[in-house]
């Protein structure tokens, strides 16, 4: 009853609402990793840009590091297979690109900022019009489209319409030698001669190639390949004097343009004489004075038909066959300054992108700056280390440089696009810069370090734990084997193992399950599937120590426990010898291995490097280990005494006879009470109006209740309200939270050391750390605990504070189970607040983290909030003195910067919530991950600055920003060359409609205002409600569901302006779009909106004077008449202005402009 009397409590003020908008904003920013299921590749040698299309309809353009553009195709007939990008063709030098989808639809894309927008679309119907090849003219005005029917169509890129003449295959057949009597088949390749722009070289499917002359509209020369069957394609040299023609039987030959006779080596099969597979792509260039042929495929069909290879053959006899572990999608070769000198080979594979130096006869690999294969080995866990200090970051870089010594030093050839000038940072900022490092654990036992501070996801180090496990006979140097050329017999292709993708693991027990990393010291702890915990660091010690090994048994012979799972991993015996060489892994010192028995998977870990302690949990209990002295501290078994089986299968539970009998009596009593007359019953208040879902208490004997879910080291108030003590907190699946008090001996220093009288120092005795159980909490609902965090009065987590800092008292502990949050006071453990997520939202908590949020606001707003007692969650970490009664305070040194720490949580539905602490009031709720994406939900991890990363596919990472102060997104742009004749078309339209255009401009200028938030408003107030109620979509995406509405405003207009169009233009000229990535891309429109205007006219005949108008005489009998007219107009896709809202202290984004063009439907 009290909650009804109190009502809803104190509501946040208007200032708080404004502050929430300034602090919290959800948006998808950048994408990292390798595109999922790539299907097409294209390279622009003029602007030096690379484009990749995927089977899911994604289109990505890459230039120099930092220049990334995203686009997304949309569904036509609700079939996902139609999104498959089959061909890509650049309009060279303009920045535009053409894509052909499986729906046989041709789309022209144009970059606007960091987004690719589809500006023109052309569908092809009919089987004979199935597009098989594309070729853009050197003059950038035409596109030649080859079809499977054997015809070539010309597409005018300005109007995006088919124009005459069409090169029909029957016309070509009439002009070829009579010896060729076959149907030529589909168009496989079209090439324009660089020295004769009026001539086309066309390769048909069935061994016919013709040189077509547009001036005479005839076949100038025909080339017939005898006995080769199907042709695949051709490539023309830079001089236009010869071309290389390759075929489906694995052969190729170089023909002269001026000589239709076949060359002498027309039957050359590089991997013959056995039948070979098709050559899918071929390039020809030069290395010094030698010719170099690069081709994919062509392997002997019977012996090596399953190999995925790209071969590099030089005329001096040097041959290399790059053997990859995934399918070759396509490749291209970059050349030096429009010459035949080959520089870099870029290969797009199904699972990775590889590049090689063609100027070096050894064909060394090149380390690409982006598109790295995150899933080279399957990713098994993620860990994001925030605020890594500069010294640790440099240590990791030094270790990584030792692994990169075998890569080529040639510069990356794809350097297109431009970056803003403000990206350059000063040396002073770099000295104090903090880094974000993503650590990914893999199935093969490796841990990869990725620098994710900026837009680029850069691999900086690869730590392998597999080198310390196994027998000596199994061990080999994998790194040397990967980079060496493994030559086979003389008659076979010279294979070389290439690429990093390796989906197979020698031993599944090596898989990494948990990672702990200290951002201030560089201490690394890796937990594996077989209970192994590897301890390593990046500290360069003068004295190296050999590898140590120790095991800790959690169950021993407890109740006859039998482990039915896999065996533990064996450490290599030669590493454990007393005189063994210290174990290092390319710059990292591996100090020891802790084996937890039974060898179950590590479920959670905690690290406190300053104390020298690490704790690990399994399904059977937890261990505490002193890794500095390499001695165990204690272990605790969490198994229920009734557990009689091992964890190799689900833990079985026995129900006691007493409990079974009690439940039987309860069911009996319940059955009697429900046999009364139900028709006379009146529903109670609780039955009539359920307030929330009930959180049912779970049985204590639920399976896997002994699993330790989370561990936490913290120095807080446990036994005394005045003194902090080091503690270890653990929680299980059965909602049991245990608090262990740690006794750390004082560190011995040189000042406290007392020398002996004899002068001989006694042997150093290692410090002993002890632990004892101090308190235990049992949550009633018994839901698994997913996280524990202790924070001070300002809401800052004590485990994120610097060494020696305890935070401002009092401390509070947040315990997050799968169903609810609960806040307790310390040391009394008195409940303060709780938030029932499952009862209110129907979701379960998967992950929690504390993030810091900041924004710039006016000092007046800060002063008003300070005087009005803001919520306790508001706080500032400035240098000003804080009021002990009010958490929110003013920063004296930076009065316009406001800071706040909040709780971030992820649910199993893929939603991310931001809650204030300790009030647990919701500040933001965003649908971040699709609820069906289980891998994405389980892989998501947060940073301390309000960002998140998750696996959007097996190879890609999606970046999310929750804070307005920290947004990492691509800022590079691609210059766009305007289409020719655009200006002349506009001038003609302006000249024809000068009066109407002038009137339109006058009225638009009257009603166009700039609101304080920076959004351009061009609609009249009387019609704002119409635009607000209309539901607008962008490629099937409902704009109203966007989290960032009104961040972008797109103003559109029509090319041909008439009086009616001016009237419709005044009704609604502004369409507001959302900020979206991947599936949601800004402004991908084919139709902006369909507007319907209704005009109502009422005629009262009595008020009309007696004027001799014949048209009105017919209305005399009707007296009062009301007439309603309806008119509709479709505004076609053209974007003239995109203005981004300047909010939350972000830099103002430039306004890209494009010229108006109508789309063809």
UniProtKB/Swiss-Prot annotation:
Residues 15-86 are annotated as: Phospho-regulated basic and hydrophobic (PRBH) motif. GO terms for cellular component: apicolateral plasma membrane; cell cortex; cortical actin cytoskeleton; cortical cytoskeleton; cytoplasm; extracellular matrix; Golgi membrane; leading edge membrane. Residues 1141-1161 are annotated as: Disordered. Transmembrane segments: none annotated. Keywords: Cell cycle, Cytoplasm, Developmental protein, Exocytosis, Phosphoprotein, Repeat, Tumor suppressor, WD repeat. WD repeats lie at residues 39-72, 82-128, 131-167, 189-223, 231-263, 278-320, 328-358, 380-464, 513-594, 603-664, 708-778, 787-832, 837-927, 941-964. The keyword Repeat applies. Phosphorylated by aPKC which lowers lipid affinity and promotes dissociation from the cell cortex. In developing oocytes, aPKC-mediated phosphorylation restricts activity to the oocyte posterior and is required for oocyte polarity formation. Gene3D superfamilies: YVTN repeat-like/Quinoprotein amine dehydrogenase. The phospho-regulated basic and hydrophobic (PRBH) motif is necessary and sufficient for interaction with phospholipids permitting cortical localization. Phosphorylation of the PRBH motif by aPKC inhibits the association of the protein with the cortical membrane. Essential for the development of polarized epithelia, for cell polarity associated with asymmetric cell division of neuroblasts during development, and for oocyte polarity formation. Promotes the formation of actin-rich projections at the oocyte cortex and the posterior enrichment of par-1 which is required for oocyte polarization. Regulates the localization of axis-specifying morphogens such as stau and grk. May form multimeric complexes. Interacts with mahj. Interacts with aPKC; leading to phosphorylation. Interacts with ball. This is Lethal(2) giant larvae protein. It comes from Drosophila melanogaster. The gene is l(2)gl.
């Amino acid at each position: 009853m009290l909650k009804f009397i109190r009502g809803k409590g104190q509501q946040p003020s208007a200032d708080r609402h404004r502050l929430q908008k300034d602090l919290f904003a959800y948006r998808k920013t950048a994408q990292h990793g390798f595109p999922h299921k790539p299907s097409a590749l294209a390279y622009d040698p003029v602007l030096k840009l690379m484009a990749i299309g995927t089977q899911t309809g994604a289109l990505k353009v890459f230039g120099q590091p930092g220049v990334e553009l995203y686009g997304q195709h949309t569904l036509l007939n609700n079939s996902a297979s139609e999104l498959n990008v089959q061909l890509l063709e650049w309009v060279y030098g303009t920045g535009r690109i053409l894509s052909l989808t499986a729906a046989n639809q041709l789309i022209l894309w144009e970059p606007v900022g960091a987004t690719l927008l589809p500006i023109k679309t052309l569908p092809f119907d009919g089987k004979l019009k199935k597009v098989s090849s594309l070729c853009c003219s050197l003059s950038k005005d035409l596109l030649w489209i080859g079809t499977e029917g054997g015809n070539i169509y010309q597409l005018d890129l300005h109007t995006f319409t088919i124009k005459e003449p069409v090169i029909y295959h029957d016309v070509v057949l009439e002009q070829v030698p009579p010896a060729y009597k076959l149907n030529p088949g589909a168009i496989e390749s079209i090439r324009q001669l660089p020295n004769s722009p009026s001539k086309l070289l066309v390769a048909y499917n069935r061994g016919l190639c013709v040189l077509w002359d547009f001036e005479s509209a005839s076949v100038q020369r025909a080339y017939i390949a005898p006995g080769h069957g199907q042709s695949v394609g051709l490539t023309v040299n830079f001089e236009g004097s010869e071309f290389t023609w390759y075929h489906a039987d694995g052969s190729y030959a170089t023909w002269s343009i001026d000589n239709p006779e076949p060359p002498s080596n027309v039957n050359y099969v590089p991997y013959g004489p056995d039948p070979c597979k098709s050559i899918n792509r071929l390039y020809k260039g030069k290395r010094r004075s030698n010719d170099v042929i690069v081709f994919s495929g062509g392997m002997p069909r019977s012996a090596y038909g399953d190999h995925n290879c790209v071969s590099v053959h030089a005329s001096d006899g040097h041959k290399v066959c790059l053997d990859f572990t995934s399918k070759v999608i396509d490749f291209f070769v970059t050349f030096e300054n429009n010459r035949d000198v080959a520089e870099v080979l870029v290969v797009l594979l199904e699972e990775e992108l590889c590049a090689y130096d063609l100027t070096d006869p050894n064909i060394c690999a090149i380390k690409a700056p982006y598109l790295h294969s995150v899933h080279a080995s399957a990713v098994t866990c993620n860990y994001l280390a925030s605020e890594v200090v500069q010294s640790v970051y440099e240590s990791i870089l030094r270790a990584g440089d030792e692994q990169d010594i075998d890569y080529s030093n040639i510069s990356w050839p794809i350097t297109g696009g431009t970056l803003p000038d403000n990206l350059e940072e000063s040396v002073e900022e770099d000295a104090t810069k903090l880094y974000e490092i993503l650590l990914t654990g893999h199935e093969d036992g490796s841990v990869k370090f990725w620098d994710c501070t900026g837009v680029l996801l850069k691999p900086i180090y690869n730590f392998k734990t597999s080198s310390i496990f196994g027998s000596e006979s199994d061990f080999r140097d994998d790194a040397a084997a990967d980079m060496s050329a493994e030559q086979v017999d003389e008659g076979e292709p010279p294979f070389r193992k290439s690429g990093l993708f390796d989906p197979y693991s020698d031993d599944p027990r090596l898989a990494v399950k948990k990672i702990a990393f200290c951002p201030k010291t560089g201490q690394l702890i890796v937990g594996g599937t077989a209970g192994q915990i590897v301890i390593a660091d990046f500290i360069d010690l003068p004295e190296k120590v050999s590898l140590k090994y120790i095991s800790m048994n959690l169950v021993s012979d407890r109740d006859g426990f039998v482990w039915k799972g896999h065996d533990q991993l064996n450490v290599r015996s030669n590493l454990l010898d007393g005189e063994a060489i210290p174990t290092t892994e390319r710059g990292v010192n591996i100090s020891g291995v802790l084996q937890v028995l039974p060898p179950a998977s590590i479920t959670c870990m905690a690290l406190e490097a300053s104390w020298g302690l690490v704790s690990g949990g399994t399904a059977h209990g937890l261990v505490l280990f002193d890794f500095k002295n390499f001695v165990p501290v204690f272990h605790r078994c969490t198994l229920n005494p009734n557990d009689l089986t091992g964890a190799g299968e689900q833990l079985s539970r026995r129900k006691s006879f007493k409990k079974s009998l009690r439940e039987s009596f309860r069911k009996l009593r319940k059955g009697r009470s429900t046999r009364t007359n139900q028709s006379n019953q009146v529903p109670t208040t609780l039955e009539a109006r359920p307030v929330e879902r009930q959180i049912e208490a779970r049985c204590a004997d639920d399976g896997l209740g002994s699993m330790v879910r989370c561990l936490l080291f913290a120095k807080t108030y446990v036994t005394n309200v005045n003194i902090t003590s080091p503690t270890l907190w653990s929680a299980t699946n059965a909602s049991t939270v245990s608090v262990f008090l740690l006794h750390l001996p004082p560190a011995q220093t040189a000042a406290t050391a007392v020398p002996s009288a004899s002068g001989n120092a006694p042997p150093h005795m290692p410090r002993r750390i002890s632990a004892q159980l101090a308190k235990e909490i049992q949550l009633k609902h018994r839901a698994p605990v997913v996280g524990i965090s202790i924070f001070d009065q300002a809401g800052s987590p004590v485990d994120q504070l610097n060494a020696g800092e305890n935070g401002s008292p009092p401390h509070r502990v947040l315990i997050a189970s799968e169903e609810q949050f609960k806040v307790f006071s310390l040391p009394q453990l008195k409940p303060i607040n709780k938030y029932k997520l499952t009862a209110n939202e129907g979701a379960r908590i998967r992950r929690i983290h504390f993030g810091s949020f900041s924004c710039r606001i006016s000092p007046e707003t800060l002063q008003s909030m300070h005087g009005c007692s803001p919520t306790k969650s508001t706080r500032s970490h400035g240098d000003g003195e804080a009021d002990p009664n009010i958490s929110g305070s003013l920063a004296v040194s930076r009065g316009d910067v406001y800071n706040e720490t909040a709780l971030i949580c992820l649910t199993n539905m893929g939603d991310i919530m931001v809650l204030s602490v300790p009030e647990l009031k919701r500040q933001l709720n965003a649908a971040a991950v699709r609820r069906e994406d289980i891998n994405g939900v389980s892989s998501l991890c947060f940073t301390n600055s309000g960002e998140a990363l998750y696996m959007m596919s097996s190879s890609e990472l999606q970046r999310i920003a929750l804070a307005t102060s920290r947004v990492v997104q691509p800022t590079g742009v691609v210059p766009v060359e305007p289409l020719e004749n655009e200006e002349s078309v506009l001038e003609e339209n302006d000249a024809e409609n000068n009066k109407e255009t002038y009137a339109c401009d006058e009225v638009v200028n009257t009603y166009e205002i700039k609101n304080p938030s920076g959004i351009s408003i061009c609609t009249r107030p009387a019609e704002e409600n119409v635009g607000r109620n209309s539901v607008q979509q962008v490629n099937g995406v409902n704009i109203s569901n966007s989290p960032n509405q009104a961040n972008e405003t797109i103003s559109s207009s029509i090319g041909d302006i008439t009086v009616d169009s001016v009237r419709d233009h005044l009704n609604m000229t502004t369409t507001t779009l959302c900020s979206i990535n991947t599936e949601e891309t800004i402004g991908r429109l084919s139709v902006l909106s369909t507007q319907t205007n209704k005009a109502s006219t009422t005629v009262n005949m009595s008020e009309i004077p007696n004027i001799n108008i014949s048209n009105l005489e017919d209305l005399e009998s009707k007296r009062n008449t009301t007439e309603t007219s309806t008119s509709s107009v479709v505004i076609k896709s053209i974007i003239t202005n995109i203005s981004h809202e300047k909010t939350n202290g972000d830099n103002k984004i430039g306004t890209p402009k494009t010229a108006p063009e109508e789309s063809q439907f």
